[in-house]
Amino acid sequence: MTEYNWNERHIITFPEETLALATKDLHVYYGAKEAIKGIDMQFEKYKITALIGPSGCGKSTYLRSLNRMNDTIDIARVTGEILYQGIDVNRKDMNVYEIRKHLGMVFQRPNPFAKSIYKNITFAHERAGVKDKKVLDEIVETSLKQAALWDQVKDDLHKSAFTLSGGQQQRLCIARAISVKPDILLMDEPASALDPIATMQLEETMFELKKNYTIIIVTHNMQQAARASDYTAFFYLGNLIEYDKTRNIFQNAQCQSTNDYVSGHFG
């Protein structure tokens, strides 16, 4: 078995003016267990960044920390900085609901509301006091078009969201997330429950979305990371080992552990 130098690191950085988000010395603890170990990482605007690594490496925990989703776990504790527009959104005085408007989340399995397709999009807006039907109609159409779903559902908006296929439900969840105009979309293995055709459709949607959004995606699928992302980050045991342009990670990794992981030799 290969002995790796786990102190070896190769992590790129970006000019300040190109950043969508960054973390500094980010740690996540579940009780006494340290799940994320002091990660410094930057994300470039309007790019797709894939987080990869074996199960339990911390990539989903890291992703969930970015918009404070770990706050919902009683034993979780997050320290360090999460910098969005120069502001540390990990401060305890920050409104987590406002943070999540700017950093939207799409989960592993499609989770549409038990409502119509239309109401899935308008629910949050109506809760916020938007009553003008013309405004709501426009939000629905714009969001569904951006998620590449409008043409398939425009005549069925008042049918249950559960009548949609799995891939369509996931794109509905994307439409719901972008309807509140976030800057960043966080995706936690969004294609894991989808068939290959729906996965390709989702990736095509992501390519269109990155014109307007920064996307950070967790994936176990190496082919998906290689196809769909601009940058890839390799996590192992709570550490960020290597972070670079995707083509470099897959063709010229600087760390032996990264090279062996993406080529299927461990993990």
From Swiss-Prot:
Subcellular location: Cell membrane
CDD domains tied to this protein: ABC_PstB_phosphate_transporter
Domain ABC transporter: from-to ranges: 21-262
Molecular function terms from GO: ATP binding; ATP hydrolysis activity; ATPase-coupled phosphate ion transmembrane transporter activity
Binding positions (ATP): G53, P54, S55, G56, C57, G58, K59, S60
Keywords: ATP-binding, Cell membrane, Membrane, Nucleotide-binding, Phosphate transport, Translocase, Transport
Function comment: Part of the ABC transporter complex PstSACB involved in phosphate import. Responsible for energy coupling to the transport system.
Catalysed transformations (reactions): phosphate(out) + ATP + H2O = ADP + 2 phosphate(in) + H(+)
Gene Ontology CC annotation, any one: plasma membrane
Name of protein: Phosphate import ATP-binding protein PstB 2
Membrane topology listed for this record: Peripheral membrane protein
Subunit composition and interactions: The complex is composed of two ATP-binding proteins (PstB), two transmembrane proteins (PstC and PstA) and a solute-binding protein (PstS).
GO biological process terms, semicolon-separated: phosphate ion transmembrane transport
Top EC group: translocase
Enzyme Commission number: 7.3.2.1
Family as reported in the entry's similarity comment: Belongs to the ABC transporter superfamily. Phosphate importer (TC 3.A.1.7) family.
Species of provenance: Streptococcus pyogenes serotype M18 (strain MGAS8232)
